[in-house]
């Protein structure tokens, strides 16, 4: 029977990030395929089939072929228990992605070989660098036309400001793609796929050494010569591999492959598991000390809440990242924010919308806790006499705003419940005019597609039709002043500025332009504004 330390050190918990359509969900499913968690991978946008991506569980995700919520996927591979946090790639869902990255110990960055680093990748990468977690790069779609690999490496280093080390090297691309050269093993893995096995089985990979005469026949003489030149150049000029730099997020190992055809996925997975750390210590915000993952004391934090994963039961699940110790079904833990002990009667493992009861889980694991309405994003749970509280994370200021009311006033109860539950998940933020109720609310979102998702979910999950009116505001700022030192109603503001409050009564200001923000700051000397709200945990 494995010890507590052995169980925890076998865990690997990472997030997969990318720009939309770079192949993130496809790579996720191929990792599951190699891990034996699934037998057939779904086609994310397949029109010929009724299959859908395993990690895309919400109806709207299956219809649109995009990920709009974060999924948690767990499987075992070669003695390691792997937790994948599959994050939304769509640019309108970056806030959920941000919180999910707080639960990861490292990240895999998927890049489209034809496009290089894109806008969404930059934003998510910056979140990773704030935490100094290891970042691995998978350059995808090498079986299609792609940019020069040297150009791609330079692109990553210049735009993201991180050094790179290619773990393998591509041999041509597109229709002429022949495979990759494994720099560590000093051998060629030849690309071999008939194109009909995509998503159904694992492809064979043919091995051959550089300089072997058989390589001329396998990849062609011209490709063989070009590969030899490239490797000589890399060995002489490229950054040296430094595992310590990797684990501090200063050097990104780069792998080339094709997730759709399964090529390069298993070699990537093996190297990734070899190089990535076991669960990392987390800082206790109260004491400033690091919490040892292998401590006997259980601790964890809620980083996500999802309502209606099972529409038949109108449930709410709190996603908990275990930071130390061991979870046992039926255990009691201290809920820091509530100030009392609660019984954790049931924990569930999470494979998108499929759930199974778990009797135990360890630091590094993500479990789902049934939430009767007591949990919020950022809550800390712990055991032991010394309570811990994990550091806070900011909330992004929304950039799009709309006034929302229900069409049928008789469905006010369902409307309020739906709005509050969806807001508690963190996909939207809801506000109201100072001192008003929930007759009409102001919804703020990071991207406009979230408004469409809100309308869809209220109709589909709560049977509520809504009216939505766009508001002419683009910026939101939290007011940091204490209520007794500032009278919000008497601030000197422009006509396109609006004073509102969030659902906890915290005051905020909506602005129509940056000029209006400057006016407010210049004409109200004591006013303190912030671009970020704060969730403390």
Describe the residue ranges of each PLM region.
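Structural and coupling elements of P-loop NTPases
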Residues: 1-537
């Amino acid at each position: 029977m494995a010890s507590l330390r052995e169980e925890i050190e076998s865990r690997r918990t990472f997030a997969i990030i990318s720009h939309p359509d770079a192949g993130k969900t496809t790579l996720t499913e191929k990792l599951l395929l190699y891990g034996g968690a699934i037998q057939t991978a779904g086609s994310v946008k397949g029109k010929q089939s009724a299959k859908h991506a395993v990690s895309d569980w919400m109806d709207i995700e299956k219809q649109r072929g995009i990920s709009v919520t974060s999924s948690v996927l767990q499987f075992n591979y070669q003695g390691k228990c792997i937790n994948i946090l599959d994050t939304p790639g769509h640019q309108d869902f970056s806030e959920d992605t941000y919180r999910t990255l707080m639960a990861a110990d490292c990240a895999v960055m998927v890049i489209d070989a034809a496009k290089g680093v894109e806008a969404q990748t930059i934003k998510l990468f910056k979140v990773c660098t704030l935490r100094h977690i290891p970042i691995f790069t998978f350059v995808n779609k090498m079986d299609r036309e792609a940019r020069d690999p040297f150009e791609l490496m330079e692109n990553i280093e210049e735009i993201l400001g991180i050094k790179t080390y290619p773990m393998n090297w591509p041999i041509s691309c597109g229709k002429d793609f022949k495979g990759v050269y494994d720099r560590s093993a000093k051998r060629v893995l030849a690309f071999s796929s008939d194109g009909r096995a995509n998503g159904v089985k694992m492809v064979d990979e043919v091995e051959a050494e550089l300089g072997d005469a058989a390589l001329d026949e396998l990849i062609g003489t011209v490709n063989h010569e070009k590969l030899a030149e490239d490797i000589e150049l890399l060995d002489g000029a490229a950054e040296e591999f430094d595992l310590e730099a990797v684990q501090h997020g200063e050097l990104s190992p780069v792998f080339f492959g094709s997730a759709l055809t399964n090529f390069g996925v298993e070699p990537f997975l093996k190297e990734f598991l070899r190089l990535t750390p076991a669960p990392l210590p987390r800082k206790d915000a109260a004491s400033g000390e690091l919490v040892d993952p292998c401590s006997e004391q259980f601790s964890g934090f809620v980083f996500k809440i999802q309502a209606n994963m099972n529409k038949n039961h109108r449930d709410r699940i709190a996603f908990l990242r275990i930071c130390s110790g061991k979870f046992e079904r039926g255990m009691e833990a201290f809920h820091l924010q509530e100030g009392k002990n609660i019984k954790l009667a049931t924990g569930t493992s999470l494979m998108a919308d499929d759930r199974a009861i778990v009797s135990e889980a360890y630091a590094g694991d993500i479990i789902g806790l049934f939430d009767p309405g007591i949990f919020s994003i950022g809550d800390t749970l712990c055991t032991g006499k010394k309570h811990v509280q994990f550091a806070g994370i900011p909330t992004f200021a929304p950039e799009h705003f709309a006034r929302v009311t229900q069409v049928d006033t008789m469905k006010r109860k369902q409307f309020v419940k739906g709005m509050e539950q969806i807001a508690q998940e963190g996909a939207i933020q809801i506000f109201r005019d100072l001192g008003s109720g929930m007759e009409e609310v102001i919804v703020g979102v990071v991207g406009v597609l979230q408004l469409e998702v809100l309308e869809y979910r209220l109709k589909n999950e709560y049977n509520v039709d809504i009216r939505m009116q766009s508001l002419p505001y683009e910026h939101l700022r939290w007011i940091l002043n204490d209520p007794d030192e500032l009278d919000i109603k008497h601030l000197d503001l422009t006509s396109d500025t609006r004073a509102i409050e969030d659902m906890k009564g915290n005051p905020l200001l909506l602005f129509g332009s940056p000029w209006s923000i400057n006016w407010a700051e210049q004409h109200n000397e004591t006013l303190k504004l912030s671009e970020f709200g704060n969730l403390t945990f």
